[in-house]
Design a protein with these regions (language model features):
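Right-handed parallel beta-helix
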Residues: 1-28, 32-33, 38-53, 65-77, ...
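Glycine-rich beta-solenoid repeat tracts in large extracellular/virion proteins
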Residues: 2-7, 24-36, 55-62, 79-103, ...
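Long, contiguous C-terminal flanking segments immediately downstream of a protein's structured core
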Residues: 73-224
Length: 224
């Protein structure tokens, strides 16, 4: 299953849990349908991402301004099957020009305080090394996809913002504190139903409960 497509002109996505998705964790819509990259301002903070991949993780953002602040990334068994996504915060790409943006439009990103958990037993030593590097410097986890166009002037520095983009005030925790807050309160938390309880247990324990019905493994569903 896919995670979601997030975007907006002044949108904050915070304290969400995305678990067991093969891709789109999330896909950022960008300004491809509006043609107004300066107005696309999207804030992602204090979210928990678990067991994404192996197709992809978070990606796209063709035009726009984005904060990635204090999110918690926990690779799971499916993530661990593909080394290059185990430490990926996001993979931005240029617009291909088929909608309203001009071809070659990139998003701009502020990235700070994001944390990767390396407790999954299936992670390779290479993945654990890269996770440590990403925790020390979050930009190690930003992986531009240049298939639709080269980086501006060929330099990743040109899609970096030195300051976060202004959005509505949001109570912000450290990534590690947010992990506990999200797992304690996300979803219908007053009385957990069996689905929410199962997913949260999977996240806490770093495992999965079910295989897919049509051949998918490592916790990914493949039927509706």
């Amino acid at each position: 299953g896919y995670g979601g497509i997030w975007g907006g002109e002044g949108a904050t996505f915070h304290h969400n849990l995305l678990a067991h998705h093969k891709s789109r964790t999330p896909r950022l819509c960008g300004s491809r349908y509006t043609g107004r990259p300066n107005d696309e301002i999207v804030d992602l903070r204090n979210n928990v991402f678990y067991n994404w991949g192996p197709t992809n993780g978070g990606y796209a953002g063709e035009g726009g301004n984005y904060n990635f602040i204090n999110n918690y990334y926990k690779p799971g068994p499916s993530t661990a099957t593909k080394d290059n996504i185990t430490y990926r915060i996001f993979s931005p790409n240029a617009d291909d020009g088929t909608q309203t943006n001009a071809p070659g439009v990139w998003g701009v990103f502020y990235v700070s305080g994001n944390y990767f958990d390396d407790s999954c037993s299936k992670l390779s030593s290479k993945s654990k090394t890269n996770i440590a590097k990403t925790n020390a410097d979050n930009w190690v986890g930003i992986h531009p996809n240049t298939n639709n166009g080269a980086l501006p002037e060929g330099n990743i520095e040109n899609i970096k913002s030195p300051v976060e983009f202004k959005t509505a005030s949001t109570t912000t925790h450290t990534a590690i504190a947010a992990y506990e807050k999200v797992l304690d309160y996300v979803g219908a938390s007053l009385k957990r139903d069996v689905i929410d309880a199962r997913v949260i247990s999977d996240v806490r324990n770093g495992n999965y409960t079910f295989e897919g019905s049509n051949g998918s493994s490592n916790g990914l569903i493949d039927s509706q």
